[in-house]
C-alpha cells in the first residue's frame, strides 16, 4: 500500500450534487433520518469520529452527508475515510467521485491540511458487523489512530453517535472463523464474513445482501473536542480515546433509552 495521499480533486462536486436528491429520498423517506446539532461541526478542518452501523448496507455516510450539505451548503467539501474493499474493481471511481478515500493517515492528513472535513469510523468493519447483542455499544476495537491524526493536524475531534442503523437487519455474528477459512484478510483486508438474517433472502453470509428494513436512524453530533486544550500538549492517547468513547457511549445510552421499539424508533 502506498503512503502517497490520494488526489482530492478526484472528488466531483457536480456528481455529489446529482447524488444528493437520491440520498435525501433514501435517508428521509425510507430511514426517517434525524440528525441533531450538525451545526456543531466547526469551520475549517475537522475530524468527525462516528460509530458505524448497518453492515454492508451502512447508511451512516448518506445520513450525515445529507444533513451536512443541507446545513453548510454543497460548496463545503466532505470526505470519508473508507475500507479498501470499496476501492476494488469498477466501484473505485464511483466512490472517489463522491469523496471517499482509502482510510490511510496520508489521506486524512491531506484533507485536514487542506481545511476540509473528513469522517472516520475507527471501529470500521469490526463495528459495523457487530452482532445484535452489541447494537448499542461503542467499540473501536482498540483503534486509536484517529486521536493521533487530530493532534498531528491540530484539528478538533467531532464525535458523532448514531442509533437505528444496525436494526436494518439482524446481525447474528461477525463470522470471523468463516472469513479466516476463506482467507478474506488476504483477499479483501477484512477478518469478517457477517452472518445476518433479513428480507428477502433470510439467512445470508454477507451475500446476497438483504433489503434493509426501514429502521429510523437518529444521529447526534456532540460538542467538538480540542484535544490539546482538554488533555495537554502531550496527552495520553489511550486516555483521550477512552474519554471520547465514554462521551459517545453516554449519548448512545440516552438515545437507546428514548427508543421505544426496534426499527420503528
Regions found by a protein language model. Give the residues of each.
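Residues in well-ordered beta-strands of folded domains
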Residues: 36, 49, 81, 121, ...
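Catalytic core of membrane glycerolipid acyltransferases/transacylases, capturing the structured
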Residues: 42-108, 114, 124-141
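Non-catalytic C-terminal accessory region of glycerolipid acyltransferases
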Residues: 1-16, 109-265
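Hydrophobic alpha-helical segments of integral membrane proteins
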Residues: 18-22, 26, 91-94
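A broad, low-specificity signal marking well-ordered, structured residues that form hydrophobic/aromatic
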Residues: 33, 46, 78, 118, ...
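A generic local structural motif
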Residues: 33-36, 65-67, 105-106, 205-206
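Short, structurally constrained coil/turn elements
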Residues: 29, 72-74, 213
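Helix-to-loop junction immediately C-terminal to a conserved catalytic motif
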Residues: 22-52
Amino acid at each position: 500500500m502506498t503512503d502517497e495521499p490520494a488526489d482530492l480533486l478526484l472528488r466531483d462536486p457536480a456528481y455529489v450534487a446529482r447524488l444528493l436528491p437520491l440520498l435525501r429520498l433514501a435517508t428521509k423517506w425510507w430511514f426517517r433520518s434525524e440528525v441533531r446539532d450538525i451545526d456543531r461541526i466547526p469551520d475549517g478542518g475537522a475530524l468527525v469520529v462516528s460509530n458505524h452501523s448497518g453492515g454492508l448496507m451502512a447508511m451512516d455516510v448518506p445520513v450525515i452527508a445529507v444533513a451536512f450539505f443541507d446545513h453548510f451548503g454543497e460548496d463545503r467539501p466532505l470526505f470519508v475515510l473508507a475500507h479498501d474493499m470499496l476501492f476494488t474493481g469498477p466501484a473505485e471511481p464511483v466512490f472517489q467521485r463522491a469523496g471517499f478515500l482509502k482510510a490511510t493517515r496520508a489521506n486524512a492528513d491531506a484533507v485536514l491540511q487542506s481545511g476540509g472535513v473528513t469522517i472516520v469510523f475507527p471501529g470500521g468493519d469490526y463495528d459495523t458487523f457487530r452482532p445484535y447483542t452489541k447494537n448499542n455499544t461503542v467499540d473501536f476495537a482498540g483503534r486509536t489512530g484517529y486521536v493521533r491524526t487530530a493532534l498531528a493536524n491540530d484539528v478538533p475531534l467531532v464525535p458523532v453517535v448514531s442509533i437505528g442503523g444496525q436494526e436494518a437487519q439482524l446481525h447474528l455474528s461477525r463470522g470471523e472463523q468463516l472469513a479466516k477459512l476463506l482467507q478474506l484478510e488476504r483477499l479483501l483486508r477484512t477478518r469478517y464474513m457477517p452472518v445476518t438474517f433479513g428480507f428477502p433472502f433470510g439467512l445470508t453470509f454477507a451475500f446476497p445482501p438483504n433489503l434493509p428494513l426501514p429502521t429510523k436512524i437518529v444521529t447526534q453530533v456532540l460538542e467538538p473536542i480540542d484535544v490539546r486544550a482538554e488533555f495537554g500538549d502531550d496527552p495520553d492517547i489511550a486516555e483521550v480515546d477512552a474519554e471520547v468513547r465514554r462521551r459517545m457511549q453516554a449519548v448512545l445510552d440516552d438515545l437507546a433509552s428514548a427508543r421505544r421499539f426496534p426499527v420503528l424508533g
